[in-house]
Amino acid sequence: MIINAKGPASFAEKYIVRSIWENKFPPGSILPAERELSELIGVTRTTLREVLQRLARDGWLKIQHGKPTRVNNFWETSGLNILETIADLNPEGFPVLVDQLLSARTNVSAIYFRGALRNSPDTAVEVLAQIHQLEDTAESFAEYDYLLHHTLAFSSGNPLYVLILNGFKGLYSRVGRYYFSSSEARQLALNFYKELEVLAKAKNYVDVPALMRTYGINSGKMWLQLRDDMPTSIALQEANS
């Protein structure tokens, strides 16, 4: 098992998570005793204890006082916060993960974009006004796109959408910079922003779902043209930190 890590705690965390991912510690199984596991990984028991607590908070493990630590089925117990970890574990499957991520975001964003234009159209107009000074660079578009989604999610009337977006942030920022490196993708997005601005100024939230659906289809087609050339390094947290 080859693991790149910045320190003992990072190494221990990646060792345990990869062992769970590769079914060496399958769901429902009991982890080796703390002393045995610390010797196996090569870290102190104090470091291991901190790592186990962190993994339990993320849903990988179940720790109960006086009982051995049990491995969870992370698909049932973890949240969006492990997306980055899954990308790290399976870079070959990263394009499919991104497909699923973008599909989920498109479906959810149609709800909070409509809610934002209904509940707070002035906020939408204000954030959309920034498109007229937007630099034509991948970084600027990626940052603005996230800002737009975050602002509209917060003003939609349901702040839970913001928490969902936060779970996407790390991966989406990296993928966004790659996606918006295409001038065609930037132009497609800019046209969408302008159409959304027209709706916001007219306080027309009714037509938002249709606009979102059209943009989702067109941006999805654009993504399919770009995904096969995406560098695998985008999947790795260490390479992008």
Swiss-Prot record:
Entry annotated with the keyword Transcription regulation: yes
Biological-process GO terms, alphabetical = fatty acid metabolic process; regulation of fatty acid metabolic process
- PROSITE patterns attached to this UniProt entry: HTH_GNTR (PS50949)
Under SUPFAM superfamilies, the record lists: GntR ligand-binding domain-like, Winged helix' DNA-binding domain
Q: Which Pfam families match?
A: FadR_C (PF07840), GntR (PF00392)
Repressor is among the record's keywords: yes
Residue ranges occupied by any HTH gntR-type domain in the UniProt entry: 6-74
Query: Which GO cellular component term is one of those annotated?
Result: cytoplasm
Keywords associated with the record: Activator, Cytoplasm, DNA-binding, Fatty acid metabolism, Lipid metabolism, Repressor, Transcription, Transcription regulation
Which Gene Ontology MF annotations are present? DNA binding; DNA-binding transcription factor activity; fatty-acyl-CoA binding
Which InterPro entries does the entry link to? Answer: FA-response_TF_FadR, FadR_C, TF_FadR/GntR_C, Tscrpt_reg_HTH_GntR, WH-like_DNA-bd_sf, WH_DNA-bd_sf
Localisation: Cytoplasm
Q: Which residues bind DNA?
A: 34-53
- Say which domain of life the source belongs to: Bacteria
Q: What does this protein do?
A: Multifunctional regulator of fatty acid metabolism.
How does the record describe its quaternary structure? Homodimer.
State the protein's name.
Answer: Fatty acid metabolism regulator protein
